[in-house]
Amino acid sequence: MKWSALECASIRAWEEELSRLTINDLQLMKNKGEKIAAGVCYDVQMTKIWERAGVDLLSVGDSVSRTFLGMEDDSEFSLDAMLLFGKAVARVAHRAVVNVDMPTVTCNAGPKAVEEAAKRIKSETLADMTKVDIRTQEEELFDDVLAVIGTGFPVYPQIGFDVWEPSHGSTKDFDHVMKWCNAVQDAGAVMIDLTNVSHEIYSAVANAIKVPVIGGQSGPEADGRIYVSYLLTGYRSDSIDKNDGTPSAAKYIYEIASDAVSKIHSGTW
């Protein structure tokens, strides 16, 4: 039987839909002891690279404001800007679950603003969930988590401590994160990003909490690991001069660009 172009396109779309992971698939991975691989990215090309590598979760982080846009203050980064990057990643992600962060400025604007933003992220980016960062402000911002849940859009709260501080591992730290991980889980969160705690705390929380618990500093004791693409690959200008053996995509690009510039200047290209 010969299929028409339209029929072939429909079959490809159907096959892609069957292969697409869901939030429930991530939960099943935890239940079976399989680890969740997550990557933070903001653009089409990095999304395609991660997908080819087999990533399970793509997170469009509000860190794009600093990494790509050169902003020094999160208050400069708007929801409209976040939606632009969220659309780019969701448009080409065919397998991974996609998260789009709630911008910090929106989180600080109150539950009503968060509710409206969640609706826009869901409808305009077609992402699977949104991450609400309530680190160090769990008491003040917990209602933001409830606001997203009230819209019916899955929420993925970030709990814990700032990454520039030493790792937190005291009994007090454990009690703090355990309290709030239980709170967001009981409220209906589908996943938790636990930030900057000791491996012992990651282990204890991941074992006690039913939903997946992953983080950017976690080891195999958690349910998975998040890597920021541009740190992982060294796609940062400050990695050009490093000689510590870590990956440096920037150095590779720099050498190619430098050679091209030299040839143009000398008229030998």
Indicate where each model-derived feature is located.
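Alpha/beta enzyme core
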Residues: 2-269
